[in-house]
Amino acid sequence: HRIALDPTPAQRIALARAAGCARVAWNWALAEWKRKYDAGEKPSFRTVQAAWNAAKHGLFPWLKESPKDANLTPLLDLATAFRNYFAKRAKYPRFKSKGRDVPSFGISNDKFRCDGRKVRLPVIGWVNTRQALRFEGRILTGRVTFTAGRWFLSAAVEADHFRPAAPEGSIVGIDLGVRTLATLSDGTKIENPRALRSAEKRLHRANLSIARKRRARDKALGPAKKGERRPIGKNLAKACKRAARVHARVASIRSDAIHKATTRIAATWTTVVLEDLHVRGMTRRAKGRGRVAKAGLNRSILDAGFGEFRRQLAYKLPLHGGTLVVAPRFFASSKLCSACGVKRASLSLSERTFACDSCGYSVDRDRNAAINLCTLGARGTHACGGEVRPGDLGRWAHPVEAGIVARAG
């Protein structure tokens, strides 16, 4: 659960100090890890922690002014980062910069507590929040982050509350799009808020302001040398914060719309069938004529958040006893006639109504694709709504994909 904090000016300084201490601890631990590795040793969390505890008070006596966990959690995060690196799930950890990385620090569950619309943080004290914690249960972890001029607390809560199961055996196909975020096979349409398009003018003005201030700075300082880091003045910092606030609002609107849609779908349907969209290929740059129009389409596709829509369904459906089925990437859901099954040779993006050349059936293009996805999932789902298994889908058979629950094709 992520809630916004409402700290006093003094508490803002204390929160920024704690985030700075966490950054210092991370950078020191990463340098120590690399030093031990270059010396032929096998660094670990325990060895780096022992070296940190022995050196921190002599090198950084001001660490005592911040919560203890702000200096400990970076070491745990670094150990996790190296595990992900060696498992080839992430890149090599890098040093954190004050201007580049998001200020944050972690707090263990026994160090803070919530009481209504306020939370008690160690050393900092009681901090007001914009809303109360929605979930009741044991708090597992907490992390305070600074985003677009606001402080947030993210708390993981072990909640044991009842989630109603979806009707048994219900199945739906979903076609994702730009104009309409999701079209369901039963005809339901979920509108796309298009948050980025509504904020384009404000974002354009903010970026112009940043560009003007950077040009003025570079004119005063002369040509920049290779690798030189230019200072950021107060006016430039204010302009960057204005742009960051616009981006944060766009992200919040998009996240809110997707959360509401996926929660309603997960509580209504037992089996949900999505197509495996190749977003990176869909948003590849065009060359020559039409590249400006393609750039606008790319922005709209990325603004819709197809990947986030699928990610949320993947973890919400099992909570309601449901299953997510992912159709094969090259399954022609838009070109197949949902009435007779005949595939059209071509279908342009401008054709919003599907008309079958064989049987004459006419239907909305997006709903036709959603019905085909629903039919594909029904062929591989038992009457009770179980998982799709190899062999159930004929030529579209494919092993079950771990982490996404099921894959069709």
Question: For the regions a protein language model found, what residue spans apply to each?
Answer:
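Long, hydrophobic, amphipathic alpha-helical segments used as structural scaffolds
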Residues: 30-37, 82, 86-93, 159, ...
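Broad gene-expression machinery/nucleic-acid interaction feature
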Residues: 2, 77, 102, 116-118, ...
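Positively charged, helix-rich recognition surfaces that bind polyanionic ligands
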Residues: 13, 24, 123, 135-138, ...
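Acidic carboxylate diad motif detector
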Residues: 46-147, 299
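Gly/serine-rich nucleotide phosphate-binding loop at the start of the catalytic core
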Residues: 1-71
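Generic detection of short hydrophobic beta-strand segments and adjacent strand-loop junctions
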Residues: 1-5, 126-131, 189-192
